[in-house]
Each structure stands twice: as structure tokens, then as C-alpha cells.
A protein has these predicted regions:
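Long, low-complexity intrinsically disordered regions
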Residues: 1-44
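Glycine- and acidic-residue-enriched helix-capping/strand-helix junction motifs
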Residues: 61-75
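Short acidic/histidine-rich motifs immediately flanking catalytic phosphotransfer sites
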Residues: 110-117
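Short Gly/Thr/Asp-enriched flexible loops that form oxyanion-binding sites at enzyme active sites
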Residues: 128-137
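Short, acidic/small-residue loops that bind anionic groups at enzyme active sites
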Residues: 137-153
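Short, glycine-/small-residue-rich phosphate/pyrophosphate-handling segment
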Residues: 152-198
């Protein structure tokens, strides 16, 4: 890397800041506008950690019903998530468990540390009220994700106890479901927080 004299260093450009300042100088930007631009820049620079949590039987991907779930393994999911996270400036922590209590513990960790979550609850989707209640305490974006489209499968899979506490659901795109979910998380992180009530 070539060292440039301080006078020749380019000015850093914050994401969205240039559009905010298009019609007026920086001194006239309101504090919320500056905060929003800095929040997005800090997210990219600091690599916000996203937990990508996977429920029961997802450790068997690649060998379990490949006609439904595809040939990709959990290692492939982790690699795709890491690559997408790198593109988005996010650090991705991919985990899998067959144990409901462990999954709930990870959700508590995310809430305590204000970490966004991409969650494939697998079979817990349909009946785990413990998971639902843990997710209701979330403090950061949450996107539910599924490799297959549950709505096209058995009737018992049509119910999700997770959907009502998630920001949204991505389903039916195989491995790409995770990539799309991470992009949704990045978008949610970049949005300004909702205005306080009256």
C-alpha cells in the first residue's frame, strides 16, 4: 500500500450522505440525518455480526431429501452466507442445533447483544412456542428463512409460530433463501429507526 501525504488523501464518503447533502451544505443537515448516515457507515465499517441459526435436521442437508432441500450441505450454506456477508460488510456466525433449548439460548444471546438474526427454525417453525416467546424479545432485525416453500408441502407445515414475530420470511429459493435473507437484514439495519410515538 502506498502512503500518500495527508493533503492528498481523498475525503471519505458516507453512504447516502452525498444524497442527503445534495441541496444544502453539511452544516445544515439535521442531526437525525447525520446519525442515519453514520449508522450505515459504521455498520459497513464495523462488520455487524448476524447470527444465522439453523434448527433440527439441517445438519443433514445434502443427504436428507435432496429432492426437496437440494444437494447443498450445511457447510455450503455457511460458505454462501460468509460470502454474502462479506459483500454486505457483515460478519456472519452460522450455527446449527437439533436441541430446542440450545436454539432458544442463542436467541436470548442475540437479544442481549442486539444481534440481527436469520433463522431457519426447521420443524420448530410449526410448534415451538418457547422459540416464539424468545424471538418476541428480539432487539434487532429477524428474518425467518426456509430452503423449501412450506406452503406447497404438507398441511402441518403451513403454520409458522415464528412468522408473527419476524420482520419477514424468505422461503422456497434453496440456498439463495439465506443470501436474500442476509440482504434483507442489511436493508433493515440501514433504515432509520421508527419515530417515537406521541
Amino acid at each position: 500500500m502506498t502512503d500518500l501525504p495527508a493533503a492528498e488523501l481523498p475525503e471519505p464518503v458516507l453512504p447516502e450522505a452525498s444524497s442527503l447533502a445534495a441541496d444544502r451544505p453539511e452544516a445544515e443537515l439535521t442531526e437525525p440525518e447525520l446519525t442515519d448516515a453514520l449508522t450505515e457507515a459504521e455498520m459497513i465499517a464495523n462488520g455487524v455480526t448476524v447470527l444465522v441459526l439453523n434448527g433440527p435436521n439441517l445438519g443433514r442437508l445434502g443427504s436428507r431429501e435432496p429432492e426437496i432441500y437440494g444437494q447443498a450441505t450445511l457447510a455450503d450454506v455457511a460458505a454462501a452466507c460468509a460470502a454474502t456477508g462479506e459483500q454486505l460488510g457483515l460478519t456472519v456466525d452460522v450455527r446449527q442445533t437439533d436441541d430446542e433449548a440450545e436454539l432458544v439460548g442463542w436467541v436470548h444471546e442475540a437479544a442481549d447483544e442486539r444481534l440481527p438474526v436469520v433463522l431457519n427454525p426447521a420443524a420448530f417453525t410449526h410448534y415451538s412456542y418457547a422459540l416464539h416467546d424468545a424471538l418476541a424479545m428480539r432487539t434487532a432485525p429477524l428474518v425467518e428463512v426456509h430452503l423449501s416453500n412450506p406452503a406447497t408441502r404438507e398441511a402441518f407445515r403451513h403454520t409458522s409460530v415464528v412468522a408473527s414475530v419476524a420482520d419477514g420470511t424468505v422461503a422456497g429459493f434453496g440456498l439463495h433463501s439465506y443470501e436474500l435473507a442476509l440482504r434483507a437484514v442489511a436493508t433493515l439495519l440501514a433504515e432509520p429507526p421508527p419515530a417515537a410515538g406521541p
